[in-house]
Amino acid sequence: MIKPLGDSALLIQLGEEIDITINQRVHTLNAILSAASFNGILETVPAYCTLLVHYDPLILTFDQAARWARGQMERMDDTTRRTPRKLEVPVRYGGVSGADLEAVAASKGISPADVIRLHSGREYTVYMMGFTPGFPYMGTLDERLVMSRLETPRTVVKAGTVAIAGSQTGIYPLDSPGGWHVIGWTPLKLFDPASETPFLFVPGDEVKFIPLPAPKLDDHA
């Protein structure tokens, strides 16, 4: 489905739920559209199950942009899917920057060590980027860690904080407000505006969290 979004964008909807297969199709289509040169197309923005396409309304009408997008969609197949990058993220769980670890464990009737084991025991896909520059929305959590957001968000969550909410996990790239349960911290820099590649993650990446022993990393408070 392709529909207009304002007077200078169109939205391509490939599904209606958070699903890895749908999300992979989004990223496949995004790669195709990004590689195709077409006068008037400005930018593409992938999300969970949609792809937003910005165009210049002085050059293209909605119908022209949609017709081009449909033509590119016909090129979608398994052979065009980008091979995902695999990234490891070191994490110090608990401590000041992982202050919700024990509360998460208690609410689930498991130990903090179990939370760490479950969180670090699988690979996550970066479904999309958003909220603040470089924030990766990743899934899917083990169902035993699925939790609602905090009733009262924090006014400040430190950059590098690893958190969970719903069936997702993410990392705060900047000091910012946040309503997710914070369970750890990573020393990796997720956003560097001075770099030619300012974002550590891109949609479609596969991420594995690696627990760090406490003595190897100073607490990030």
Question: Where do the protein language model's features map onto the residues?
Answer:
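Glycine-rich active-site loops that engage anionic ligands at enzyme catalytic sites
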Residues: 1-221
